């Protein structure tokens, strides 16, 4: 619903609604519809210059000489929009992604944090991680356990291996995304075949065909860079990375996980370099993921707190004991660290939320917020709203006030809601009689935003009257 609303708002040029959807509802700015079009494309096509500038400033991608960039330029309704696309720095530079997980994977590839093997391709070094390559590619998993086993440096001198194409292949393995100059596409296809990456090969062939059709039908366009990007709901990357979490679980917590279908390839070695001990359970993990995703674990493992590590035993990795967390809750943290996802029941979400806050994991906090949003009803909405305020979960807080607006005529009779309004009023520093109350303002906003027909106007007025009557009865005028 939010995604379709975003596309409709971009076609209409409703900057306020788009800002609300991106900043309050966490809708992805580069989402695509069934016609492979982005919000930025519709804003350009419909001539909404202010909205185009806002989208670019908030991470919309429009790199020069790519399919998306050329499509936006060609479809732009006015010269000012075309100039904005050409002049804006994000047209020529990769934009900052809103997604914490994508940011992390890109940094992991570019910086080689805690890498354990270096590939040297015709003199160019690539610092990579055995665990990532093995989880993403059966070919690399096999080679790293046989021909390249135990090697910290792997030198590739074959004349058909292009270092530019090899770098693009690594980008795909780490991020699910690939950017390659059209002159190197054939080299990339050759590597994809060699590494048995059939999905990538299929995506490359389909993208080449689409770009060829676009260039042939749009005179004056020039696509120099081919971009492969998975659709938003594509689970392949996260499922592959979750394999590392499967392998990190201690035997006593695996349960039915290791029954058929067997999640780990036979003999797959994830090459863990850190062991977390939680209430007697040992989780064999990777510093690259924990340090890269959490400042808490970076301080624990990398900085001056490294004395917390216990020496390795019997050839295993060094161990760190974690306190104040149960194995079940840490399992949720584990899967989030590797795959950016974990199955959370609303009941478990409270415990995980507290730990996510302690471990400085805002993305996991958002997952907890989504789970808690599923349990909203008249009895729970005020309590969940308080939790959202406490842990600064803006989207969940907005969902709570949106739900409150729907049932406000019943909520005004509940003591917990009345107390929440009084506390909000008291929290406004030096509040004057006519100062607004944030909770009340948010409810009013959602009541008003639902009005689209004449019949809805009367219903909205009834809800607002119920709220105003409550405010008068408790001596608040705002």
UniProtKB/Swiss-Prot annotation:
Molecular function, one GO term: translation elongation factor activity
Any one Pfam family match given in the protein's UniProt record, by short name: Ank_2
Coiled coil: 451-477
GO cellular component: cytoplasm; cytosol; nucleolus; plasma membrane; ubiquitin ligase complex
Stretches forming ANK repeats: 1-31, 35-64
Residue intervals of the BTB domain: 115-182, 272-346
Keyword Signal listed: no
InterPro entries membership: ABTB1 (IPR044515), Ankyrin_rpt (IPR002110), Ankyrin_rpt-contain_sf (IPR036770), BTB/POZ_dom (IPR000210), SKP1/BTB/POZ_sf (IPR011333)
Function: May act as a mediator of the PTEN growth-suppressive signaling pathway. May play a role in developmental processes.
Alphabetized SUPFAM superfamilies for the sequence: Ankyrin repeat, POZ domain
Name recorded for this polypeptide: Ankyrin repeat and BTB/POZ domain-containing protein 1
PANTHER family, alphabetized: ANKYRIN REPEAT AND BTB/POZ DOMAIN-CONTAINING PROTEIN 1, ANKYRIN REPEAT AND BTB_POZ DOMAIN-CONTAINING PROTEIN 1
Annotated compartments: Cytoplasm
Cysteine pairings via disulfide bonds: none
Tissues/organs with expression: Ubiquitously expressed in all fetal tissues examined including heart, brain, liver, and kidney. Also expressed at lower levels in both adult heart and hypertrophic heart.
This protein's UniProt keywords: ANK repeat, Coiled coil, Cytoplasm, Elongation factor, Protein biosynthesis, Repeat
Chief place where the protein resides: cytoplasm
